[in-house]
């Protein structure tokens, strides 16, 4: 299962104010790679960097480099982002949605972009860390 984790998943997994579900999700992804894998765009990596201490950011980068590489934002087709903007999404949200679609990911895991669920016919799921953990457990049986 290919997942895109929003910046808040990493911030709550590596930062000072941890959420247990986010920490557990990062651990499970690491333990079950490549069955469960991730992709990350530069935009999310930079956002994470703005919210972590240098030490926490080094840990985050180590996690990322063990599992994937950071995709440059310009590789996502501009037209795909425009399609999401035309649906009413703000530019950063449109980019994230376009990135998830472009990668062919199964889900965007986020704690705060659930407004995307109001848009019908998205080619991916939008779930939080807790629901993603449940999904992983149910598909591992």
Q: What are the residue ranges of the model-derived segments?
A:
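Short, surface-exposed acidic-centric catalytic microdomains
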Residues: 37-72
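Acidic, PIN/NYN-like endoribonuclease modules and their adjacent C-terminal/linker elements
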Residues: 106, 113-141
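Active-site neighborhoods of divalent-metal-dependent phosphate/nucleic-acid chemistry enzymes
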Residues: 70-113, 117
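A short acidic, often aromatic-flanked loop/helix-cap motif at beta-alpha or helix-coil junctions
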Residues: 46-47, 73-81, 131-137
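A residue-level structural signature of the nucleotidyltransferase/glycosyltransferase Rossmann-like core
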Residues: 2, 37, 107-108, 124
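Short catalytic/ligand-binding loop motif for oxyanion handling, primarily in non-cytosolic enzymes
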Residues: 12-13, 47-49, 116-118
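Anionic group-transfer/hydrolysis microenvironments
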Residues: 8, 43-44, 112-114
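Short, well-structured N-terminal submotif of metal-dependent ribonuclease cores
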Residues: 1-40, 53-56
